């Protein structure tokens, strides 16, 4: 049980969806500096958020006792008596009602995927602003850490959580070849569990492939890159967050709702591989002239 004043954050979803909540959590921490923020979710993602100062501690979403909690029956001792909470749960009202009894601050339940046609990160910030006196920056990327190192290599992530979001393996191979012929002599590919499972490694034979052991290692790898190009995925959201110059390809999804945030991020929306490749080169040429 926590004796210090505590505030509960609950998010059990995918990495990219979780990162879209980070501007809201950042703004909340600014107005609640003396509270210990406890996260409930996937251990790997909670630990990552903790490494960026968004959480102080966490509880794995599969921990014993949480089933009754998510059913709105009882609060486990490990959670204690939070003074307030934000719950990103599809059906979170029962849990919210349970937490409101001992709370002195608002307990807010937010639908993770609302019907409103607005960017999710902005929607989350506005939802919190109706309960807490937070200040939302004009650019949500101002909530992200400053980039500390100059990159040494370019990275391509050819996968995502859905095959429909991806282009053909040949597209990424051609892209890597063209990058090497320009200003990026070192170009690597990021392979995670989804790529290992759904992609044919032979399609990338002879390429430099990185397989980060966890998302914290992935964050370190991305931080050291001078360029990142990927699809609509959690990896792309993390690249934008750590400040890597990022180009995100939206083959089937809408960046107006799900777009990666960051200080140097470009969205390209086109299902045609030739057009997408052309747009990438236009973006790189613009960045080169800008620098």
Feature-to-residue mapping (PLM):
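Catalytic machinery of carbohydrate-active enzymes
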Residues: 1-291
